Curated annotation (Swiss-Prot):
J domain location: 381-451
Organism annotation: Homo sapiens (Human)
GO CC annotations on file: cytoplasm; cytoskeleton; cytosol; extracellular exosome; membrane; nucleoplasm
SUPFAM superfamilies, alphabetized: Chaperone J-domain, TPR-like
GO biological process: one example: chaperone cofactor-dependent protein refolding
Modified residues (Phosphoserine): S393
The keyword Chaperone is annotated on this UniProt entry: yes
Official protein name in the record: DnaJ homolog subfamily C member 7
Database matches in Pfam families: DnaJ, TPR_11, TPR_16, TPR_8
Entry-linked PANTHER family: DNAJ HOMOLOG SUBFAMILY C MEMBER 7, DNAJ PROTEIN P58IPK HOMOLOG
């Protein structure tokens, strides 16, 4: 708000005038004094009324217009104030305060160059005027902020633009252009509530402001409320048919909505290849639309998971959470892909993030399941040791044991180096452990459920794999390995 401006006193006329003129001037002076009194009490509306009465009585008095301009400035009505200030200096070009008020109005409205001209004229009339000197510096500062902001906007350094506009608005509080630029940059930074607030304030004063309508639409567009956004873009284009930014945004919004809907339709119909292509095309429309693009990445990740391209699905979900780190659905999708690829630590991390954000029973159970799989993954994988899947039958487990036990039996590697013998002995023991657990339904159930087998009284530390081997192949002395045949050994039952 502009600083309170001083009111001017009209000197009595020195030359005799007609009685009617003198009475009019006396009455006008009375109205002016009443206006001054209300101004001093900060009742600017009443002050405005009395200054207007004074002007009606004496429309050629420059100071009356100057006083009313000062009052309008205090009411924040800078455009009207500018008209009065300009009229005051038209009537009296030597009226320093008139030039100061004209410059102050120009500056408040964001026209810093015009403000400089007014302040320069005031300094020509009174070169020692401290207010004119300071206001001239302020106007030049605003021009510098404008220049920096223009360059930084081209560089997409939106934070710097917001900073410059905040500084400029300290001197130009009524400049819609600065406010709109700030609001647009706030929207580009994802600070939508702040941007909406600035645009809404302007629209309350001017409901036809195309720039403000565009910014309102831009915020909705970036918040993925595309239908509502299009309505604002269309309204902005009605107000200003040549509004280039609104035109581009409207076109992008419609294209993005159509591609996304087509992709969703293809996905529901099970046409995953087409859905992938459509989501990919949608992602190329507007890289600035972070929220919508996060959803598109997540959708494409879901498609990739359906196509069993799990690494690609993980990458898409990662891109989604990079754009929107609060996007729960993307974390859940990525966590499931991590589970499917046995990356349990990563899955636990994602489920922990989800559960910290939304503490539901479902999310808690997903986290517990991932933690269990992580615990199980750190034990020996007996299925992998035998080379069977988790649904292997009893016969398949026996066949696998026979094959692996013979493959790793120490006698078969008696001629190998000490290092190889040690490694094969270790593998032979693990094969026996695996068979002991997986061939026993109760032990297998406990193993599959992730229970600590040692705590269940099945400590494998003293386990002797030879006992299993002998029992499996028919007792002691019932087998031997010799260097013979293509396999360099032969097996013989007793």
């Amino acid at each position: 708000m502009a600083a309170a401006a001083e009111c001017d006193v009209v000197m009595a006329a020195t030359e005799p005038e007609l009685l009617d003129d003198q009475e009019a001037k006396r009455e006008a002076e009375t109205f002016k004094e009443q206006g001054n009194a209300y101004y001093a009490k900060k009742d600017y509306n009443e002050a405005y009324n009395y200054y207007t009465k004074a002007i009606d009585m004496c429309p050629k008095n420059a100071s009356y217009y100057g006083n009313r301009a000062a009052t309008l400035m205090m009411l924040g009505r800078f455009r009207e104030a500018l008209g009065d200030a300009q009229q005051s200096v038209r009537l009296d070009d030597s009226f320093v305060r008139g030039h100061l008020r004209e410059g102050k109005c120009h500056l408040s409205l964001g026209n810093a160059m015009a403000a400089c001209r007014s302040f320069q004229r005031a300094l020509e009339l009174d070169h020692k005027n401290a207010q004119a000197q300071q206001e001239f510096k302020n106007a030049n500062a605003v021009m510098e902020y404008e220049k920096i902001a223009e360059t930084d906007f081209e560089k997409r350094d939106f934070r710097k633009v917001v900073f410059c506009m905040d500084r400029a608005l300290e001197f130009a509080p009524a400049c819609h252009r600065f406010k709109i630029l700030k609001a647009e940059c706030l929207a580009m930074l994802g600070r939508y509530p702040e941007a909406q607030s600035v645009a809404s304030d302007i629209l309350r004063m001017d409901s036809t402001n195309a720039d403000a309508l565009y910014v309102r639409g831009l915020c909705l567009y970036y918040e993925d409320c595309i239908e509502k956004a299009v309505q604002f873009f269309v309204q902005a284009l009605r107000m200003a048919p040549d509004h280039e930014k609104a035109c581009i945004a409207c076109r992008n919004a419609k294209a993005l909505k159509a591609k996304k809907e087509d992709g969703n339709k293809a996905f529901k119909e099970g046409n995953y290849k087409l859905a992938y292509e459509l989501y990919t095309e949608a992602l190329g429309i507007d890289p600035n639309n972070i929220k919508t693009n996060a959803k598109l990445y997540c959708n494409r990740g879901t498609v990739n998971s359906k196509l069993r391209k799990l690494d690609d699905a993980i990458e898409d979900c990662t891109n989604a959470v990079k754009l929107d780190d609060t996007y729960i659905k993307a974390y859940l999708r990525r966590a499931q892909c991590y589970m499917d690829t046995e990356q349990y630590e990563e899955a636990v991390r994602d489920y922990e993030k989800v559960y910290q954000t939304e503490k539901t029973k479902e999310h808690k159970q997903l986290l517990k399941n991932a933690q269990l799989e992580l615990k199980k993954s750190k034990r020996k994988d007996y299925y992998k040791i035998l080379g069977v899947d988790k649904n292997a039958s009893e016969d398949e487990i026996k066949k696998a044991y026979r094959k692996r036990a013979l493959m790793h039996h120490p006698d078969r590697h008696s001629g190998a180096s000490a290092e190889v013998q040690k490694e094969e002995e270790k593998k032979f023991k693990e094969v026996g452990e695996a068979f002991t657990i997986l061939s026993d339904p109760k032990k297998k159930t406990r193993y599959d459920s992730g229970q600590d087998l040692d705590e269940e009284g099945m400590n494998m530390g003293d386990f002797d794999p030879n006992n299993i081997f002998k029992a499996f192949f028919g007792g002691p002395g019932g087998f031997s390995f010799e260097a013979s045949g293509p396999g360099n050994f032969f097996f013989q039952f007793g």
